[in-house]
């Protein structure tokens, strides 16, 4: 698995019901709280307004790629 870093775009692999988030929602990593736990901001694509912030363990995240040459 690729290492997740601050500013990476990630998707949830599991629901996070305590924050009203569902599997597949996409967010941006904004901080790393402790080893393997990341603060992720979820925002509305149309407005850019954040609708949720959640501390999510790495095992519930998948790093997303948008350029073919970055995926390996």
What are the roles of these predicted feature ranges?
Residues 4-67:
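Basic/aromatic-rich interaction segments and small domains that mediate binding to polyanionic partners
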Residues 68-72:
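Short intrinsically disordered terminal tails
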């Amino acid at each position: 698995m690729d290492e997740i870093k601050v500013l990476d775009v990630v998707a949830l692999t599991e629901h996070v019901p305590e924050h009203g988030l569902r599997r597949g929602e996409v967010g941006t990593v904004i901080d790393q709280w402790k080893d393997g736990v990341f603060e992720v901001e979820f925002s509305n694509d149309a407005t850019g307004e954040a609708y949720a912030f959640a501390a999510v363990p790495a095992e519930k995240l998948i790093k997303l790629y948008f350029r073919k040459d970055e995926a390996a």
